[in-house]
Curated annotation (Swiss-Prot):
Subunit structure: Homodimer.
Species, as recorded: Schizosaccharomyces pombe (strain 972 / ATCC 24843) (Fission yeast)
GO biological process: cellular detoxification
Activity regulation, short description: Activity enhanced by Mg(2+) ion but inhibited by Zn(2+) ion.
CDD domains referenced in this protein's UniProt entry, alphabetically: HAD_Pase_UmpH-like
Stated name of the protein: 4-nitrophenylphosphatase
Lineage of the organism: Eukaryota, Fungi, Dikarya, Ascomycota, Taphrinomycotina
Amino acid sequence: MAKKLSSPKEYKEFIDKFDVFLFDCDGVLWSGSKPIPGVTDTMKLLRSLGKQIIFVSNNSTKSRETYMNKINEHGIAAKLEEIYPSAYSSATYVKKVLKLPADKKVFVLGEAGIEDELDRVGVAHIGGTDPSLRRALASEDVEKIGPDPSVGAVLCGMDMHVTYLKYCMAFQYLQDPNCAFLLTNQDSTFPTNGKFLPGSGAISYPLIFSTGRQPKILGKPYDEMMEAIIANVNFDRKKACFVGDRLNTDIQFAKNSNLGGSLLVLTGVSKEEEILEKDAPVVPDYYVESLAKLAETA
């Protein structure tokens, strides 16, 4: 059963139990463009106590550098090597695991974050933010679109400019069984400014349904994300706690990764009633109203 943290004594005991804290960002540190009040105090406290901090996000629209800048703008100290968005884990997978040949490229259904990270590892790509694809499908497109042996993977993430044209291109590339089908994350929704919008999982579904193929998922709660982190940061998993706002990704990620603990904050997607359900499929070790509460130690 999940333990609710609700007193200064409990906050302190919780913090003292772990050496490493891994944080989701959207719904934990901020919601959309709005910082969650009081969170900076908690982050400063953890830094002052010498805790190791790692930021892990399924948001694929931003590169590591862009994420670092956003975190810093919210008054939270962060270094590039502490930041792991799904765009980074996806590019790492393409380069180090898929080992895409130099003559192959990736078709991106997503934003600049994915493109930036692919550029960083030297992987060629098309699609993505190409402005020529932000339009309706034309009759001449139907004649031109088809399988392309030079496309070695379709990488799908959050795409704010998704079009039927992009779907048609991705669909055709995926007719080649040797073309890998990759998904940055399967989040059904995307929290922003107190609202929920369709997420990467929802954007990928037309391709899953139409091709009959299942993508390799590279974000939380899957191992590929933790492997990308562990390849760069060494820590004792049993002394680490993941802090997130979504049960089926953040908390499940902590369990899949065999971390020492998990903390759900109630400032994002999942709510207290979901934890308290009799047969709740995923339950955190701890939960708290807001990350900001942890600064109220005795």
